[in-house]
Each structure stands twice: as structure tokens, then as C-alpha cells.
Design a protein with these regions (language model features):
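ATP-dependent carboxylate activation and anion-phosphoryl transfer catalytic cores
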Residues: 7-27, 31-34, 39, 59-60, ...
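Acidic/histidine-enriched active-site and ligand-binding environments that engage anionic O-linkages
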Residues: 158-167
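Conserved beta3 strand of the protein kinase N-lobe
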Residues: 144-145
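A short acidic, helix-capping loop that chelates divalent metal ions and anchors anionic groups
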Residues: 176-178
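ATP-binding N-terminal substructure of ATP-dependent carboxylate-amine bond-forming enzymes
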Residues: 1-136, 149-157, 408
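N-terminal nucleotide-binding beta1-loop-alpha1 segment
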Residues: 170
Length: 455
């Protein structure tokens, strides 16, 4: 499928606009400046007082507090890029990071989009098509419908054939929306219609497909980097099984449940698939790992940087954002054997939410004392007197630690969480401390439905 033939031209990017906000915008600003380049930060009215904006080479307000008026406002972002004579756009994650229309518009305005092509992005954003292509690439896929479902009757026929439980998924889906687990035939029709309706509302596309439901799986993903010369490397795997309603809360690397043979097969499969589709940039292949800890199945590919890329950086020593920029400039990746993955890293997503019910807790942070110590990292845009807005994601920071092994990493994370003091709003710090003491977590027995069943 890969038809990469044209000669790659190297070009130096000098001024990069960051089409995002918060901690990932700050992180991008830092890396861009370390590379000797200029950074342009965009912001909405709601973010006008954020301190991190002052660290950029330039900043520009692009619209109102609503995402649709600012961080999703393509004309405003392109205008800002042209006004400040940017030559590239870094998308981060969320917002427009996986919007193929945005990628095409960037190209039309001679702006380098730091990520994959619109064609590959479009291919992998359609979950049903992506599954078919990954099957062609040799990836194990879950049994289910071949393409999109045309009707409830077709769903019923396939479910009868492969057996219950099944799961109905939105083709354009993500974040658990447009997704329904069907335990038996009597519930299929109502849940099929509910998934269609939710998918249409969330994504403007009601298309759905059906798969066999894997009970109590682990969520394992592989981080890859691919350059414009056809080279692909992996930066290990991550275990993201601690999640609530498909939203990740704690991530770690390596996945200690994997036998070495299974790990090698997983990593090789991801590299082969990335080459097959001609991928360029940073990407993540997500898999469901069966409870036997041996069989894994392709779930989806995220054609962007992941929130949890940080733990892959901690064990590899690579700066993934720096490499995304280098790839966009036409540079070649290092050889796989030129770096090794060492130790164990854990990330806890700290959100402005009630730690028991996960209700949002926006408002003013009256006190902020960040943890420190060797191999403790906090990626955050928040600070004392920062007002957590109601308009965006509730994450206020990512606490990341590295240890020689998993036990040391857990101990370091516990100590760092206890040091971390945030007053004025509720946060999920107490939840993370509780999870780190959980016997099943310590034994790496957590599966994707664990929190819903036990908390």
C-alpha cells in the first residue's frame, strides 16, 4: 500500500504556531525554543491570563471562550499563522489534531502540518476502514462486521453468527462515545439505535460497526515514530488499562504483564502496519489484550501525539515533540538499536474533578505546591491563582515519575502525590493515591472495566 517514492527535501522550520492550549502548548513552546526556533501561542478569551502564554515568542487571541470560536476556529488559526509568518503548525492533541480538513487547509496555505498526511489521517479516522486496512497489514483484528452496518437487521445477523456479547462502535468515534455493549439479543435493537444517535450527535456521522466484545481486556498501545524516508521505530508499549468510561487515568510503561515473545510480536506488528500505510510522524496503535495475556487485537490508531507520550520519553530519553518537528523538516530517525528502553515510568492525569464521583470542579486555585525530586516531572500550565475554566478538558497537569523498576516507580509516585498540594478546587490526587495502594493495581491485574465494577 505504501507508495513513498519521491525524494524528500529537507527544510528548516523557523517559526511554529501551536494550535492548542494548556500543558501541551507549554510543552511545545519549551521544545521549540530549545531547538532555537520561534513559537507562536494562540489563546481564547478564557485563557487570556494564562502565564504560559508569556513564555512564547509571540501570542495572539483568536476568539471567544467556546472551542468552536477559538481552538476549533480554522480560519482564525490560519489567519494568525499568516499574520505572524509561521511556516508550520504543531497541533498537539484534541481540538484539530486529527482533522484531515485542517491538514489540507494548512497545505493550501503552505504551512507544514507537524503530523501525518490528510490521506492517512482520513483512513485511520474511519474505524471500520482502519480495521480492514490493518487486517491487510497483518494485524490481528476482532471478529465482526466487514465495514459499516447498513441496518439493525444486518447487525442482528452478524451478532447471531459470532455470538454475544458484542459491541457497537461509531465509525468516527473516540472517547467512548457512540459505543454500546450488547449482552444479549433482546437488547440489540435499542442499543444499536442509541449508538447511532449518539454517534450522529457527537461526530456528525451516525455510521456504526459491530465487533465481538472482549471481556475484561487490558488496553495496551504502541508508540511509533515514522519519518519521510520510510523509516519506522517504536518507543515501547504502554499499559493504559486504568480508565473510567474509556478515559485514561493512569498509564505506565513497560506493560509488565507481557511475556517477552508477546511484546516482540506486538512491537513488530505496529512497525509493519505503520510502514504499510506510509505513516509519517508520531502515532499510536491501540490494542485490546485478552485476559490470557497472549492474544492482542487492533482497536484503533491515534494519528497524533498522545497525552501519555511522556512516559515513553522517560524510559527512552527521546523528546517526542522534538522528533515530530525533525521529521517534519525531513530529517531521518535514529536507528532502533541506537537507544534502549530503561526502567519503569508512570503517569497520573491530575484533573479538576471530585475524586469520588468525578464531577467537574472548576474555579480558582488558591494554593499550588508542585512535587519535586529526582526523576519526577510535572507537565502543567496551572499555578496559584490560576482559574480552571469550564469550557475545556478538566486536566490541570500530568505527574510523571521514573524508577529502576515498577515497585520503585510506584513508591516515587506515591511520595510525589503526597507532596503535591492543590487548594481551592477538588482534584483527583486522592483517587490516584487510593489506586496506588490497590492490591490489584500493584499486581497489574487492572482491566479496562475495573473501575466501573469496583469503584
Amino acid at each position: 500500500m505504501n507508495k513513498r517514492n519521491k525524494k524528500v527535501e529537507k527544510k528548516e522550520l523557523s517559526r511554529i504556531l501551536i494550535a492548542n492550549r494548556g500543558e501541551i502548548a507549554l510543552r511545545a513552546i519549551q521544545t521549540i525554543q530549545e531547538m532555537g526556533k520561534e513559537s507562536i501561542a494562540i489563546y481564547s478569551i478564557a485563557d487570556k491570563d494564562a502565564h504560559y502564554l508569556n513564555t512564547a515568542s509571540a501570542k495572539v487571541c483568536i476568539g471567544g471562550a467556546k472551542s468552536s470560536e477559538s481552538y476549533l476556529n480554522i480560519p482564525a488559526i490560519i489567519s494568525a499563522a499568516e499574520l505572524f509568518e509561521a511556516d508550520a503548525i504543531f497541533p498537539g492533541y484534541g481540538f484539530l489534531s486529527e482533522n484531515q480538513n485542517f491538514v489540507e487547509i494548512c497545505s493550501h496555505h503552505s504551512l507544514e502540518f507537524i503530523g501525518p498526511s490528510a490521506k492517512v489521517m482520513a483512513l485511520m479516522s474511519d474505524k471500520s476502514k482502519a480495521k480492514s486496512v490493518m487486517k491487510e497489514a497483518g494485524m490481528p483484528v476482532i471478529e465482526g462486521s466487514e465495514g459499516l452496518l447498513k441496518s439493525y437487521q444486518e447487525a442482528e445477523e452478524i451478532a447471531d453468527k459470532i455470538g454475544y456479547p458484542v459491541i457497537i462502535k461509531a465509525a468516527a468515534g473516540g472517547g467512548g462515545r457512540g459505543m454500546r455493549v450488547v449482552e444479549d439479543k433482546s437488547k440489540l435493537k435499542n442499543l444499536y439505535l442509541a449508538a447511532e444517535t449518539e454517534a450522529l450527535s457527537a461526530f456528525g456521522d451516525g455510521s456504526v460497526y459491530l465487533e465481538k466484545f472482549i471481556n475484561k481486556p487490558k488496553h495496551i498501545e504502541v508508540q511509533i515514530l515514522a519519518d519521510k524516508h520510510g523509516n519506522v521505530i517504536h518507543v515501547g508499549e504502554r499499559d493504559c488499562s486504568v480508565q473510567r468510561r474509556q478515559q485514561k487515568l493512569i498509564e505506565e510503561t513497560p506493560a509488565v504483564v507481557l511475556e517477552e515473545g508477546v511484546r516482540e510480536r506486538l512491537l513488530e506488528t505496529a512497525i509493519k502496519a505503520a510502514k504499510y500505510i506510509g505513516y509519517v510522524g508520531a502515532g499510536t496503535f491501540e490494542f485490546l489484550l485478552d485476559s490470557n495475556m497472549k492474544d492482542f487485537y487492533f482497536m484503533e490508531m491515534n494519528t497524533r501525539l498522545q497525552v501519555e507520550h511522556t512516559i515513553s520519553e522517560m524510559v527512552s530519553g527521546l523528546n517526542l515533540i522534538e522528533w515530530m518537528i525533525k521529521i517534519a523538516q525531513g530529517e531521518k530517525l535514529p536507528k532502533q538499536e541506537s537507544f534502549s528502553l530503561k526502567g519503569h515510568a508512570i503517569e497520573c492525569r491530575i484533573t479538576a474533578e471530585d475524586p469520588k464521583k468525578f464531577y467537574p470542579s472548576p474555579g480558582k486555585i488558591t494554593e499550588w505546591i508542585a512535587p519535586g525530586g529526582v526523576n519526577v516531572r510535572l507537565d502543567s500550565h496551572a499555578h496559584a491563582n490560576y482559574v480552571v475554566p469550564t469550557h475545556y478538558d478538566s486536566m490541570i497537569g500530568k505527574l510523571i515519575v521514573w524508577g529502576e523498576n515498577r515497585e520503585r516507580a510506584i513508591a516515587k509516585m506515591k511520595r510525589a502525590l503526597k507532596e503535591f498540594k492543590v487548594e481551592g478546587i477538588k482534584t483527583t490526587i486522592p483517587f490516584h493515591l487510593e489506586m496506588l495502594e490497590n492490591a490489584d493495581f500493584r499486581q497489574a491485574k487492572i482491566h479496562t472495566k475495573y473501575l466501573e465494577e469496583n469503584f
